A protein has these predicted regions:
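Positively charged, low-complexity intrinsically disordered leader regions
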Residues: 1-60, 64
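Phosphate/diphosphate-binding glycine-rich loops and adjacent basic-rich segments that engage nucleotide
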Residues: 147-152
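Phosphate/diphosphate ligand-binding glycine-rich loop within oxidoreductases
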Residues: 36, 40-146
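An alpha-beta-alpha
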Residues: 153-157
Length: 157
C-alpha cells in the first residue's frame, strides 16, 4: 500500500484538484473494467469494513471494488462488533489496524469515525455517519459528471 494513502472522512478534506484527480481515476478504472482489464492496484491488500448498521449498497460496493482491484474485504457485522461497548474504540482501531491495510466505517455517530481516525495506524474511510457520506457524494458527483450535457459545466448541474 502506498504511503500517500490518507483518511477519507469528508470531501472537504481534499482540494478541488485532488477531487478532480479522483474523478479521473474512477473514470479510467470504470473504462478498464468494461473491457475486463481492471488493474490489480490493491493486490494483497485487506479492507476491514466496520458496520454499526446493516447496508447492502455500501457493503457490496466496497467488496466488489476491493475484489476487482485485487484486494480482499472483511465484513464486520453489527452484531459482531460493538464499538465502545465490549471493547473501546481505541482498542478496536489499534487491533484492526494491525490486521488490515484500510478501515472503512459505517457508524451511527460521526464522533466514532473521528475516534477511529485518532487511534488507527492505517487510513480510515467514512462509509456513512450521522454527519455525512463522503464516498456516496463522490459517486454521485462522478455520475453527474459522466452524464452531464456537453455544453454544461459541473457547476451548472
Amino acid at each position: 500500500m502506498s504511503a500517500a494513502l490518507r483518511h477519507f472522512i469528508d470531501t472537504q478534506d481534499f482540494s478541488r484538484e485532488e477531487l478532480l484527480r479522483i474523478m479521473e481515476l474512477i473514470r479510467l478504472l470504470k473504462e478498464a473494467d468494461k473491457v475486463g482489464a481492471c488493474p490489480r492496484l490493491l493486490q494483497g491488500a485487506s479492507l476491514g469494513m466496520i458496520f454499526e448498521e446493516p447496508s447492502t449498497r455500501t457493503r457490496v460496493s466496497f467488496e466488489v471494488a476491493m475484489t476487482k482491484l485485487g484486494g480482499h474485504a472483511l465484513y464486520l457485522r453489527p452484531g459482531e462488533i460493538h464499538l465502545g461497548k465490549r471493547e473501546s474504540i481505541r482498542d478496536t482501531a489499534e487491533v484492526i489496524s494491525r490486521m488490515v491495510d484500510v478501515i472503512e466505517a459505517r457508524t451511527l455517530k460521526h464522533k466514532t469515525v473521528l475516534d477511529l481516525v485518532a487511534n488507527a495506524t492505517v487510513p480510515v474511510m467514512n462509509g456513512l455517519t450521522d454527519y455525512n457520506h463522503p464516498t456516496q457524494v463522490v459517486c454521485d458527483v462522478f455520475t453527474m459528471m459522466e452524464h452531464k450535457l456537453p455544453d454544461k459545466s459541473l457547476t451548472d448541474l
